[in-house]
Amino acid sequence: AARADGTMGFSSELCSPQGHGAEQQMQEAELRLLEGMRKWMAQRVKSDREYAGLLHHMSLQDGGGRGTGPYSPISQSWAEITSQTEGLSRLLRQHAEDLNSGPLSKLGLLIRERQQLRKTYSEQWQQLQQELTKTHNQDIEKLKSQYRALARDSAQARRKYQEASKDKDRDKAKLEQLGPGEPPPVLLLQDDRHSTSSSEQEREGGRTPTLEILKSHISGIFRPKFSLPPPLQLVPEVQKPLHEQLWYHGALPRAEVAELLTHSGDFLVRESQGKQEYVLSVLWDGQPRHFIIQSADNLYRPEGDGFASIPLLVDHLLRSQQPLTKKSGIVLNRAVPKDKWVLNHEDLVLGEQIGRGNFGEVFSGRLRADNTLVAVKSCRETLPPDIKAKFLQEAKILKQYSHPNIVRLIGVCTQKQPIYIVMELVQGGDFLTFLRTEGARLRMKTLLQMVGDAAAGMEYLESKCCIHRDLAARNCLVTEKNVLKISDFGMSREAADGIYAASGGLRQVPVKWTAPEALNYGRYSSESDVWSFGILLWETFSLGASPYPNLSNQQTREFVEKGGRLPCPELCPDAVFRLMEQCWAYEPGQRPSFSAIYQELQSIRKRHR
């Protein structure tokens, strides 16, 4: 922006959130352009190399000039053509190598620098905003304190002035009443007493408030005791950046769109997976339809007129009821807001890697807003869309649950890649490692309390018709106060009738923890979770030993089918082992419910010293 004196500088508008949003949009657009340039150059290098190879191959096919002699004009022409073809091949190959080692390489470095610059800019802006807010609040509190002190002093001075004014008025009235005459004669005692009482009456009469005093008093009652700040200048919704729009769902997997769109004309905007494109998804005639929002010359359009931003485009389509395309005739009706659980990537500060899952790394972190400690599960960007949808299945399950023995969901980051699931950070680590490192020092009552926690969490899931399918010590977490929480809901499913029929092979199935009917027929239920809970009990009281240690998965299946079961751990109470055996009943209907298991464990714990 240009200053009034003609020099160039930054406009004050860039200091506002709107300016920050515009700056971020510009950075995103530049990065998308650079990525497009890099892809174009890489394709050019590839094409030039392939073309050079084909030309070289053609130049080697010199069969046409054989037998004509070296002095034949045709032979000489053919030799010249093949020579020039070989020269062109070398030139193209050299050009491709120069492009690859020069501009393409430097462009890659530039992209990384711009990405780092964008990250640094965002972090610095957040830090400045926090410092500004903190300083602003401190200044306001200081001014408030000064104002209150001045208000008290003013009120006290006003009261003193009013009292002095009343005394002055009374004295003046008394003097006027006495007049300029001689002093009165000496009175008798009775007259003096009467005079005194008359004087008191006069003084009492002097205290009667006048109409003006009453008005002043009443106005003081209704006068506001504080000043209000001036109203803020609100930013119209259409001028807010894309990531602040309620209908922008970020990198939402395509598979989840159908669940959010329920009525004809419902729509949302999302980022295309694997491509730097935005997609407008609309429900029409009972089917979700997906339109790529074209971007050219910094204008956005599905077809026809272009707009400077996607919010302006969406606002126009909603207001005008203009069809998205002439061919489709689809009209936008209702924007579907993003989930309340959605967080921005900028809301997180990532820490060190603390683990690795099936979908990607797990990091520690904090929420910028209040420094809450969190665990951040990431999903690798290279995974196919259907796998990314499975990654979000865990968050979809946990959104509905709240229990002290179920790990708590904080939110999901789907606004851009990579996708994150944000959960409470349980700092004690997983239960299996805890048993192997701390188990020997734990009292029996503590172990009973911890498996009781697991039973309480599973009883809650059972009441919600949720089947965990992967219950094991490795998938439970321990707090610093030895409270156990059920975690890892990646394989969990909800079933209205309490039974889930799985399809596919056993590649991902934990065979040694899984009930026979689930392995044989793919039939999962709370009863199959009870079988897994029996294995969890065995892991607990064997202090983290591996079940069926000398058997393969196939041998374990055959052993269980023949009636074989795990032996009683050395330090396990008899009552707990009897409960394990009940959990391992071959028929699902003969296994106890989690409610009964919880009650039995509570009873055993009370009896145990």
Curated annotation (Swiss-Prot):
List of catalytic residues: D470
Phosphotyrosine: residues bearing it: Y500
Residue positions binding ATP: I354, G355, R356, G357, N358, F359, G360, E361, V362, K377
Zinc in keyword set: no
Keyword Protease recorded: no
Catalysed transformations (reactions): L-tyrosyl-[protein] + ATP = O-phospho-L-tyrosyl-[protein] + ADP + H(+)
SMART domains: FCH, SH2, TyrKc
Taxonomic superkingdom: Viruses
InterPro entries, per database record: AH/BAR_dom_sf (IPR027267), F_BAR (IPR031160), FCH_dom (IPR001060), Fes/Fps/Fer_SH2 (IPR035849), Kinase-like_dom_sf (IPR011009), Non-receptor_tyrosine_kinases (IPR050198), Prot_kinase_dom (IPR000719), Protein_kinase_ATP_BS (IPR017441)
PROSITE patterns (alphabetical): F_BAR, PROTEIN_KINASE_ATP, PROTEIN_KINASE_DOM, PROTEIN_KINASE_TYR, SH2
Domain called F-BAR: residue spans: 8-174
Residue segments, region Disordered: 1-20, 152-208
Keyword annotations: ATP-binding, Kinase, Nucleotide-binding, Oncogene, Phosphoprotein, SH2 domain, Transferase, Tyrosine-protein kinase
Location of the SH2 domain: 247-336
Domain Protein kinase span(s) in chain numbering: 348-609
Molecular-function annotations in GO: ATP binding; non-membrane spanning protein tyrosine kinase activity
Record comment regarding domains: The F-BAR domain is truncated and contains only the FCH region (the coiled-coil region is missing).
PANTHER family tied to this protein: TYROSINE-PROTEIN KINASE
Other information: This protein is synthesized as a Gag-Fes polyprotein.
Family named by the database record: Belongs to the protein kinase superfamily. Tyr protein kinase family. Fes/fps subfamily.
The protein's name in its UniProt record: Tyrosine-protein kinase transforming protein Fes
Organism in which the protein naturally occurs: Feline sarcoma virus (strain Gardner-Arnstein) (Ga-FeSV)
